[in-house]
Amino acid sequence: MLVNATEMLKKAKAGHYAVGQFNINNLEWTKAILQTAQELNSPVILGVSEGAGKYMTGYKTVVGMVNGMMEELNITVPVALHLDHGSYDGCLKCVEAGFSSIMFDGSHYPIDENVAKTKELVKIVAEHNMSLEAEVGSIGGEEDGVVGMGECADPDECKRVADVGINFLSAGIGNIHGKYPANWQGL
């Protein structure tokens, strides 16, 4: 059974350990990640980008695949299924499909709109016992066809988003996805 990532991460913080979040793109990756998490007796977060969700024929398919694999492989460690860098509509689809955690990437919206959309999602996830991550300031590099410049988030904007009741905040700190180029001016 999928679990909400919030409790998993609270336990990790209290126990002074990390929880890996690995993006899945197919059955083979998912199986390898689940088996390794079980072997290491480690909770795990399975991330799914919108592109990967489409590739795997939809979010309901992803939920069915993960739940089926957890049952067939006798996975007993906590597993959260998390939408990674989701649009507002993608978040709603993942709620409906049965994900246990979503990330709303509203970093490309003006801050007032990001806050308003995030606030709406806070109410929705509370009704479904899900966790919600929100982003302020873009993460640089390229992931799933999305290219960011790696800006630093405004601390006041971070506080505004955090104050609406999210579980986790993803704040751009000049970092990027992928390999750092030799001339990178961030961190």
Range-by-range predicted roles:
Residues 17-20:
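Boundary/entry segment of secreted carbohydrate-active catalytic domains
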